[in-house]
Amino acid sequence: MASEIYRRLPMELPAQHLLASLALVGALLSVGYLLLRPAKYQLPLPPGPRGLPIIGNLHQAPKEKAWEVYKQWSDRYGPIMSVNNGGMITIIVSSHEVVKNFLEKNNAVFSSRPQLLVLERALYGFTTPALPYGEKWLKHRALRGAVLKPAMAVRYRGLQDLESKQLLRDLLYSEDFTQCMRRQAASLFLGIAYGNRFPEETPEIIDIDQAVAQLGGISESMFQGTGMLREFFPVLKYFPGYDKFLKQLDDVGERLANIYVRRFRDGLSTPAWNWAKEYSKRPEAQGMGELELSFCIGSTYQASLTPYEILRIILLAAICHPEEKARLQKEIDLVVGKDNLPGWEHKDRIQFVQAFIYEALRWHAFSPLGAPRAVSRDIEYKGYFIPKGATLVLNQWAMDHDENVYDNPFTFRPQRWIDNPDLPHVIFGFGLRGCPGQHLARDHLFINTARLFWAFNFGNAYENGKKVELDLDELMQPRGGGSAFNQVPSFKASVIIRSSERRQIVENEWDAVEKDEQKILAEAMPLPE
């Protein structure tokens, strides 16, 4: 659904209006940069592909699979390189070593965001992940940290357990595993955030999904074609066609605002504990209005769907690598047995589950370029100048396919993570901008991966008695705009319970589990500080 919406969004400005502004603004930016650059920083920028006068490397901007193009460039120019987008510098990092020895050690320098004018307008300047480093972002971060810290993730396990058991039972009666898993992820977030879970897909879930998909289309448009130029050259707002674009932004922003505020008010009135109530009473919320608090919570929804996307990657990896899937099930059965569902007590005992998750994400990165960061002050690295205001991009796909770190990086081999537990990964980012919900996400991925493969065999689907082969080339093609996210499109699979005994256990566990969200969320309420 999301990818279809992306393709229907007309986000491009007329190309004939770009050249004049590019020539003028690009020249001014380039000359100004050279004239105002401090004398003490007469060091070269990191190397990169040679550009053209004025526009730099804009004509070389990849139209799809940017991470692979950047990997080819990094093989030539090194693990840290620069590109010039008409006077605006982007630093691209393709090495775990640079992340560890430079970025993490200078965390404060790389913890801001570029000023994204499009998102700022569409989201009223209240969407936490897009905020630059500053007082507002620190308050938002403190609010999220209060409900997403490790101790809180443990307290959400009651709701995780319920949603996981419903997913298993739903799969006994439905062939649409994608819809079942998406409902689960949405219901988990809506339950924690607003105090009401959704046992079935409802118009409320569809409405927020469609609005978030529209936002995703706008986000993708900023990193490709003339969409990139809107961010780099705000002067384009004076050209014909911009009013139509602004109308689209305002429509999406208004739609999201209505959804988020409505859900926020519902959360305040529901009997169960939830984030809306918790945020409202915390000292960090002093001075925040209803709209800002609503966006602070609501903007987490898109991130909450990431584990759902990752589970689909895990299922695809298992179907494409049946020998590794068989070992995964063997390891789960060895630790858990056939008479009980995997539980939290098994988390540290089934090492192969975590290894399989890490390898699936290395094999097919969901966010291969991560979210862009902004450099907050001039800094030097190994004789290269990294200027304040530059955009920082982490090529996570290149890092995950680095031959110097991973032996045979294009081979799917979960055992590598057991042989070397210290292998690096950037699944959840790093530093102050690391994913605040990673502990909740890790629990979600473990309990669902372990239980799904304990209960079911996943394999190729059959139609009219013929096996449906998966076209990996097609499935690996980027979706969305191909810049920030690499969602796996819908694919067919067979979902077969492993035995009648396991089917009965799934049914019994569902019948016995506590389903009253008010009781479950009472256990999630934070302890007094």
Curated annotation (Swiss-Prot):
Domain of life (superkingdom): Eukaryota
UniProt EC number: 1.14.99.-
Reactions this protein catalyses: okaramine C + 2 reduced [NADPH--hemoprotein reductase] + 2 O2 = okaramine A + 2 oxidized [NADPH--hemoprotein reductase] + 4 H2O + 2 H(+)
Bilayer-crossing regions: 13-35
Residues in coiled coil: none
SUPFAM superfamilies listed in its UniProt record: Cytochrome P450
Listed pathway(s): Alkaloid biosynthesis
Positions bound to heme: 435
Gene3D superfamilies: Cytochrome P450
Localization terms from the record: Membrane
Keyword vocabulary terms for this entry: Heme, Iron, Membrane, Metal-binding, Monooxygenase, Oxidoreductase, Transmembrane, Transmembrane helix
Keyword Transmembrane on entry: yes
Pfam families: p450 (PF00067)
Reported phenotype of the disruption mutant: Abolishes the production of okaramine B and leads to the accumulation of okaramine C.
Main function: Cytochrome P450 monooxygenase; part of the gene cluster that mediates the biosynthesis of okaramine B, a prenylated indole alkaloid that possesses an unusual octacyclic ring system, including a four-membered azetidine ring and an eight-membered azocine ring, and that exhibits insecticidal activity against silkworm larvae. Within the pathway, okaD likely catalyzes a key step in forming the eight-membered ring of okaramine A using as substrate okaramine C. The biosynthesis begins with the NRPS okaA that condenses two tryptophan molecules into cyclo(L-Trp-L-Trp).
Name of the protein: Cytochrome P450 monooxygenase okaD
Organism: Penicillium ochrochloron
Taxonomic lineage from the root: Eukaryota, Fungi, Dikarya, Ascomycota, Pezizomycotina
